[in-house]
Amino acid sequence: MRNLVRKFQAYWLADASFVTLLVMLIAAVFVLPVIMEVSGHGVLLFNILLLSVFFSGIFSTRSVGLMSVSAILFSIHLMLRLIRFGENPYSFFVLENVIGIANTLVFIFINLRLLFRDQIVNSHRIVGAVNVYLLLALMGALTLEVIHAATGASLGGNVVLSGTDNDYVYFIYFSLTSLTTVGFGDIFAVNTSAKMLATFLSTLGILFPAIVIARLVGLASSRS
């Protein structure tokens, strides 16, 4: 069992894992919303895929502290999800998503450490940078869920929100359009919290690629 865990960790510490994570994130960010809109099983797939992404974060670092934090957050997140979907009257929807945001932030930090752990610059590192970008979009969607659950309002326009996991379809769409500064205008923020989040995501969307590209170019130059 210990050897299996070591092999699993060795894979997630290698550059090849960036591609696997990219596939998972593309599924979560671009494919899953379509499935959730047309299928009754979309919510289950959303929760399984989200937890799978966070589970991989436990093995993506050699730092005992980060592994412990990631494992604790994953365990709490899993427990809260099971409570909500179990046959009981209890639900901690806001806390569940707050833990999800914390888990995403930790995973972003872990991936940035992997991305810049040495001076190697290759296609896998570019994929790693894309992964962080998509994780930022995921963080934005989870934050919108918290805002909507806490205030009762978040997005307006061509959208009907139900206050359930099905709203992820609209939240990830708005998060991505804000992050990429596309802003089609069909969906818009309706309260201050959502507006400031959209502004924050737009700022990240501009600064993150510039900073990462500059860093990768600097590493390539110093190596050569």
Question: Locations of the language-model features?
Answer:
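Short, hydrophobic transmembrane alpha-helix segments
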Residues: 30-44, 57-65, 86-87
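Cytoplasmic-side transmembrane-helix entry/capping segments in multi-pass membrane proteins
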Residues: 65-76, 93-101, 121-132
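N-terminal membrane topogenic signal
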Residues: 5-23
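Structural signature of hydrophobic alpha-helical transmembrane segments
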Residues: 34-50, 93-105, 169-174
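Outer-pore turret/helix-boundary of cation channels
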Residues: 36-38, 48, 139-173
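Pore-domain transmembrane helices of cation channels
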Residues: 107-153
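Membrane-embedded alpha-helical segments in integral membrane proteins
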Residues: 2-3, 22-36, 54-55, 77-85
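Pore domain of cation channels
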Residues: 166-224
